[in-house]
Design a protein with these regions (language model features):
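Structured interface patches
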Residues: 1-160
Length: 160
């Protein structure tokens, strides 16, 4: 799912609605290296509250990112949890269409009643990524001289 029609939300008597949305997620390039969400799909939990002419949208996701460790190049799998809020006023960008070729991202993630869930998920994950993706916190990395994995041979040395 790339986009979600907000009109499909069914609000209860408390003017709130909830949906779980499967969102396809493209690979991320981080530090010149590609990282993926296992299975390529993230479950986005979407809560919506309606007050007068405004919708408050709250998004939450929990997933993992996998790819090479940035220290030893072994396999790394990092948990990612992220939340965000967006607001939609009735009439804002009413009838406006998304332009996938826009140079600048629009403010917010909704145009009229269409929510760009793919872009919101990408932004949430990107903002929640750690500064360095590692296989484990104490990863020793690679030998700067020969490239040996120092996790496999912690006593690794070179004759001088």
């Amino acid at each position: 799912m790339r986009r979600f029609n907000l009109r499909s939300l069914r609000f209860g008597s408390d003017s709130e609605a909830w949906r779980s949305l499967p969102v396809e997620t493209a690979p991320f390039v981080f530090g010149g290296v590609e990282y993926v969400v296992p299975g390529g799909v993230v479950e986005l939990e979407l809560d919506a509250a309606r007050v007068d002419d405004q919708l408050t949208l709250k998004a939450h996701l929990e997933t993992e990112i996998e790819g090479p460790c940035q220290r030893c190049l072994g396999d790394a799998r990092v948990p990612v949890e992220a939340s965000g809020i967006d607001y939609v006023r009735h009439g804002d960008s009413e009838g406006a269409e998304f332009d996938d070729d826009e140079d600048e991202a629009p403010e917010g993630y909704a145009r009229g009643f269409v929510l760009d869930v793919e872009r919101w998920v990408r932004d949430l994950i990107g903002e929640a990524l750690p500064l360095q993706i590692v296989c484990r916190e104490d990863c020793a990395g690679l030998c700067p001289t020969c490239g040996a994995d120092l996790n496999e041979d912690p006593g690794h040395t070179h004759e001088e």
